Structures are given as structure tokens and as C-alpha cells.
Amino acid sequence: MKKNAVAFVVSLVVLILIISVQESFAQYDFKNSEIFLFQKNEIDWGLHYYSGSEREETRTETWREYEELTTGAVKFQFKNQFWNFLDYKQERFDFNLEAGPLWGNGNWVDSSSVANIEADHNIFGLRTNASVSYASRYYYNNKNYTLVQINGWARYDFYNQNSNGISTDSNEVVTGFEETTKEDKFRYSVDARAGWGMGRLKPMNHFMVADYILKNYYSERNFSQADITKFTNEIGRIKHQRDARSGHKTDVESAQMQEYLNQKMFLIPVSSLEEEWKTGEFLPRFDGNRVEFGPFFKYYNREPDFIYGGYLLFDHAKYCTARWNRNFSAGINYNAYKKQDWILAELSIGWSYFLKLRSQFDFGFKYVPGIAINGSGNDGELNNGFIPYVGYFTQINSKSRVDIKLSCRISEDEKLMLSGPEFSVSVYRSRY
């Protein structure tokens, strides 16, 4: 199994390199000193469906409880996202709140010196969760920065559980086990990291809009990268005046844009540009390279409860054309824990394809290897995890969106992750 996994990874890496080398359609060369600004506050509300697998284990010297579940949930979602990417800092803030019905099925084991219970169970109830995150990269010159990042989340589940299985007591007597109970779970986690880094990922959203409009509506004229950049700055000036609380008028903004095209670039206004202006609202897409390192910690109110260590992360993004973006990242963490230390790495490569200014297709692959260092009989053993993924995002109009994600976790021994698919659909309204 391990030989097959390694062979698969090697083959995939070779294929990725071949494809990447052949991507000669990349048209732009952005200088390190060239900085694009991006400021946006987005408020979303709608419905979010999620289905996936989860597990939990608690051990003491005399007792062990283990549970695996495949769950689904449909929740009302409220989300607030804020980006403030300037020349001297890059900030991001996210807040998310969800609540709705929860259902699922799985199995659990409750083992002690008194009895061992193994049962299948079904659950139905309510799931609520909230999360908040903040990250700030402060640039004390054009290339070097310091990082502060903190994340936190909490989840409360309340549900009915129907269990059916067998119980084996200390005398090896086996009896049937059937139980209906009301259960609740409260889980929360906090993690933070500080870091130092070099490089910058430039937000390319406004450049993408400028690139697309000029190339598609004025194809008879050749535009230099400098021409597109000037138009990019004007698009940013218009969009950065928005207020998410009061909203904005796309017809007024579109008129400002077309006036710039006419007065500054001597182009004839096109009436259909207003429809294009209503879309083009994607999550930040980037170009550039960045490497950072530093300490981190993570606290979770179940085992493993407190982890600390250090990390090294490299990010690369390439704006190829208005339609294509390529993304690559490689990171490694040293995780220290009271019972066992381990090294965990992650390699990720993916592509994004943008259909006009309305839709986005994502696809890619993550490889997650891990090695236990001490405290285990499996010291030095390599464990592998694989996560292929696809995604689709579309803007139905200036305010309505659909976001679909599908991934599959693949693990040979399930020490790093629980194998199985993850699927989510969000249908929501947006104000920005």
C-alpha cells in the first residue's frame, strides 16, 4: 500500500510539472515593487449544507471511548469578511455564525474494566457553531513582514441518539445493547501563530476585471501591462469607496468606469459593461511568492488538547490570464504534545478557471505526510493522506451566489485523517 501511495504521488508530481511547464500562456511579469491594493467588506447570509465524516477519541488508563460519525447539516449562515490589503499591511478578518438541524449515523466503542460496548447509532438534533479569525502581515519594508494570526471556533450539538449493539462484561458474557439517550457536545478550539516572512502575494481581483474588460470589449486595440494597471487603479478607487452597510449603486459606479475609459483611454463606452460590472466579485486571487516561519500553538478542549511548535510555509500564486490562476503551497510543522511529538507536512497544488466575470472552477490536490517522533511504537513510520478537491462558485446576479465544494480524504491507515468525502453547498445573498 505504501509503495503504491508513493508511486502515485511521484507520478502526480511529474504530471503537475509537465503541465506547469507547458503553461506558456502566462502573459504578465509583475515586478516585486508593483503593489496592488484591495479593500472590501462583505456581509453574507443564506443556507449552508455540509456532509462529512468526523471522529473523536478519549483515553485514560482505565477507559476508552471512540466514536465515528458521518453527519449532515443544513444551517442558516451569517458571515462577515473583511480584507484590507495596502502597501504596508495585509489584514483579513472573518466571522461566521451557523445554526440548523443535524443528523448522522456511525458507531462507537465504550471500553472499561467493567464492560466493553460496541454499538451503531443514529443521531438527530441541532448543531450551532461560530468562528472568528484575524490575520495581519505588517510590512516594515517592501519585502519583509511580521505576522500575527489568531483563530477560534466553538460548536454546540444537542441531539437524540439511538444505539444498537452488544455489551461484553468482564466475565466475557455477551448481551444485546439498545439505548435511546439525549446527548450534547460542546467543543471549542483556539490557535495562534506569530511569524516573520519575505515576499508578498498581490491581490489581482481589480487587475482581472480591467484585463477582462479591455481584452473582450476593445480587442481591436493592443493594451500594454501599464495601460491595464492604470485602469486597475481606477477600478480600485471606485470599489474602495463602497460601504457594506448602505450598499452601492452599480449604475453609478459603471458610469464612472466608462467615463474613465472615454476621457483617459479614449475608448467608446459600451452599454453592456454595466452587466459585467455587477459581477467580478470573487474571493482574492493572487500573484507572487511568500515564505514565512515562526512559532504556533493550538488548544482544543478534547484530546489532543494542547499542541505547540514551529512552522515553515511557502506560498506561490501565478496570475496566468484573466481566466487562469495557478496556486502552490508547501508547509511543514513540528508539533509538540505531552504524549507524542510529530512532524506534519502539506503540499498543495491547484488551478482556478474563471468563466467571464461570473463563475469560478477550482480543482487540485493536497498531499499530507506525517511522521511520529517519540512516545509511540510507530516512531519514524511515514503516514500519508491525500485530498483531491473540486469547487464551483457562481454569481447569479450582483447579490446572489452559489458556492459548491467537494473533496475526498484518502488515508491508508487513517492515523492522519478519517477517510471519506466532504461536500458542501452554500446559497446566499451578499452585501459589499
Task: State the predicted function of each range.
Residues 39-41, 68-76, 120-130, 144, ...:
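Residues that define the transmembrane beta-barrel architecture of outer-membrane proteins
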Residues 83-93, 138-146, 202-206, 320-326, ...:
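Repeated loop/turn-to-beta-strand initiation elements of outer-membrane beta-barrel proteins
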Residues 43-47, 93-99, 146-152, 194, ...:
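Membrane-embedded beta-strand positions of outer-membrane beta-barrel proteins
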Residues 189-207, 417-432:
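Outer-membrane beta-barrel "beta-signal"
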Residues 195, 201, 209, 265-373:
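Detector for outer-membrane/organellar transmembrane beta-barrel domains
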Residues 47-57, 82, 99-109, 124-126, ...:
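Transmembrane beta-strands of outer-membrane beta-barrel pores
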Residues 54-64, 104-118, 158-175, 209, ...:
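Outer-membrane beta-barrel translocator domains and adjoining extracellular loop/strand segments
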Residues 26-84, 108-110, 288-306, 430-432:
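Short glycine/proline- and aromatic-enriched beta-strand/turn motifs that initiate or cap beta-hairpins
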